[in-house]
From Swiss-Prot:
Residues 1-30 are cytoplasmic. Residues 51-448 are periplasmic. It comes from Dickeya chrysanthemi. One of its GO terms (biological process) is protein secretion. The chain crosses the membrane at residues 31-50. It is found in: Cell inner membrane. Coiled coil: none annotated. Belongs to the membrane fusion protein (MFP) (TC 8.A.1) family. Keywords: Cell inner membrane, Cell membrane, Membrane, Transmembrane, Transmembrane helix, Transport. Its main location: membrane. GO terms for cellular component: plasma membrane. This is Proteases secretion protein PrtE. The gene is prtE.
Length: 448
């Protein structure tokens, strides 16, 4: 093979290689374009059909259901013992601190003694009013009889009841004895009066017979005159006796009236005293209830289970003013809530019941899952931030039980920052890109 043949063969091989490379490059270019078109088509298909969550971003903070419980005392007083400190977990009803009880106990016992005296007096006056021989069995006295200290009080009032009733009885019996004497005198006077009336009638008949005879001188005139004198004397005695009978009857009526008046005065006195005692008793009952309430509340107790925070009382023997805040309790085992804010222009997109995804930014974002929750409250009117004057609408989100479990025991404290996303629906990526443009279309080409 000559040198020229070798050169020609090499050129042919080189041309074939260039042709093969050109075809490979064209094939790769076509494949690349097909891949680009397929990717773009797939992207368009995804952008048109794939659902994306739409919603409103929320910034908020963790709060406790019912908020922190402020511990105060209505009356105040002197601190006897402090039984908790900041950070202590307390049960509902646990004693937090105890106030000095001397003043409250003294007041309660004094009012209790007054109460015992008054209910015994009330029972005695009711017995006098009803003319009973023993104290009236009022519900208050029946209940109080069980206490040993009531025995002496009841005995004193029973003695007073008997004494007053006996005094009244003796007074009335004395008047009745006078009436009996007057009635005896009245009986005697009535007999005398009857005798005088008979004697007067006899003398009258004698005069009727003597006057005609004396006129005809059949009998001496002196006998007629003597009979007339006797008649006049008897008539005078009869009139006198009749007057005494009338006076005696009036005396009897006056004595009976005296008894009625004395009984009326006694009843009036009893009723007046009973009214005063019952009014005082009602007042003492009211004061005693207040005193017993104060005594029962010398021990300040936790209203709910939770953690003691923000202690303000540290000195045993110190003085607490009425209504002074002593500490707060953050409730535990309460629903986990988040107070958030949304811009005012987003208020029409959020309502109660919408699902929310929450992220607690205080924890590691790589290990802490998004926590599900639900919008439970949206403020009825817009609010304004006191610091910068920014308007907003407030909403409250409750973390679901599933969301609590997903935290795997992480301690959530009030005040922790939270980022949230309120899911209001779904939309495509194309809708997301073109919605702002579509929202402005009605304003396009209308400006002067």
């Amino acid at each position: 093979m000559t040198g020229m043949d070798i050169t020609t063969q090499d050129e042919l091989n080189e041309a074939a290689m260039r042709d093969r490379a050109s075809r490979d490059e064209e094939r790769a270019l076509r494949l690349g374009w097909w891949l680009v078109l397929a990717g773009f088509g797939g992207f368009l298909l995804w952008a048109l059909l794939a659902p994306l969550d739409k919603g409103v971003a929320v910034q908020g903070n963790v709060v406790v259901s019912g908020n922190r419980k402020v511990i105060q005392h209505m009356q105040g007083g002197i601190v006897d013992r402090i039984q908790v400190k900041d950070g202590d977990r307390v049960a509902a009803g646990q004693v937090l601190l105890t106030l000095n009880a001397v003043d409250a106990r003294t007041t309660s016992e004094g009012l209790g003694s007054q109460y015992d005296q008054l209910i015994a007096r009330e029972a005695r006056l009711l017995a006098e009013q009803r003319n009973q021989s023993s104290l009236a069995a009022t519900p208050r006295l029946t209940q109080a009889r069980q206490r040993p200290e009531m025995a002496a009080i009841i005995a004193l009032q029973e003695d007073l009841l008997r004494s007053r009733q006996q005094s009244l009885k003796l007074e009335i019996d004395g008047v009745r004895a006078s009436i009996d004497g007057l009635e005896t005198s009245l009986g005697a006077l009535q007999k005398v009066m009857s005798s005088k009336q008979s004697e007067q009638a006899t003398l009258s008949q004698q005069l009727q017979g003597l006057r005609p005879l004396a006129a005809d001188n059949y009998v001496p005139r002196n006998k007629m005159l003597e009979t007339e004198r006797l008649f006049a004397q008897v008539s005078g005695e009869l009139a006198q006796t009749s007057g005494e009978v009338g006076r005696t009857r009036r005396d009897i009526q006056q004595q009976k009236l005296r008894i009625a008046q004395r009984q009326q005065e006694y009843d009036k006195e009893v009723n007046s005293e009973l009214s005063d005692v019952q009014a005082k008793l009602n007042e003492v009952i009211s004061q005693r209830e207040k005193a017993d309430f104060n005594l029962a509340n010398v021990q300040v107790r936790a209203p709910v289970a939770g953690t003691v925070v923000d202690m303000k009382i540290f000195t045993e023997g110190g003085v607490i003013a009425p209504g002074q805040v002593m500490m707060d309790i953050v409730p535990e085992d309460q629903p986990l809530l988040v107070d958030g804010r949304i811009p005012v222009e987003m208020v029409d997109k959020v309502w109660s019941g919408l699902p929310v995804e929450l992220q607690f930014t205080a924890f590691s974002q790589s290990t802490t899952p998004r926590v599900p929750g639900t919008v439970t409250l949206l403020s009825a009117d817009r609010l304004v931030d006191e610091k910068d004057g920014t308007p907003y609408y407030g909403l409250r989100i409750q973390v679901s039980e599933e969301g609590k479990r997903s935290l795997h025991g992480l301690e959530i404290k009030p005040g922790m920052p939270v980022q949230g996303f309120v899911r209001t629906g779904e939309r495509s990526f194309i809708n997301y890109l073109f919605k702002p443009l579509m929202d402005r279309m009605h304003l396009a080409l209308t400006e002067e």
